[in-house]
């Protein structure tokens, strides 16, 4: 269940309306066995709306969020897969390197690509990606998903280097900023050409 919670998180595939307890029910009832099953829950509409604490309105809100997540970026997708040590920051780097193209990312793994050539990717992360891809149990979780979603490529929002002194610099945001969430701050830093980091090294 934890893998599904991780996948649905708002900072990953951003599927709202599915609490951990709801996912536990879906899994225990056999409605969700892999990530792709989340996109076929309409097959269980009647059973779901009859579930305690889950009426038609809750179902429609959940379904709307699921449908919205059918279009996602490569970095969202990778971050949601649960590859050890490969989260949002690594997902952004992979998204940029492979141009938002899942097939390019998968082909690189198949060809034995050395991910340590990428910024901030060490040997452990490189090994984790290759081990994850070779794990047949993991593949049974994510492979069915590929026919359910559409990858979208983010527009290059990075501003000109002439107007942003932060271009190319690693920036750690600490404290709070009015009207901005932490993710919002990171997205703004990316727009300014900076590389957001979670801690000072």
PLM segments and residue spans:
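DNA strand-break repair and replication-stress modules
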Residues: 7, 50-201
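Cys/His-rich short segments
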Residues: 1-15
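A local structural micro-motif
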Residues: 16, 34-35, 86, 197
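Residue-level signal for pocket-adjacent positions within structured domains
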Residues: 8-10, 33, 43, 195
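Compact, charge-rich alpha-helical regulatory domains located at protein termini
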Residues: 20-21, 29-55
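Bulky hydrophobic/aromatic packing residues
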Residues: 6, 33, 38-40, 75-78
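Short C-terminal domain-edge/linker segments immediately following a structured domain
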Residues: 21-22, 97
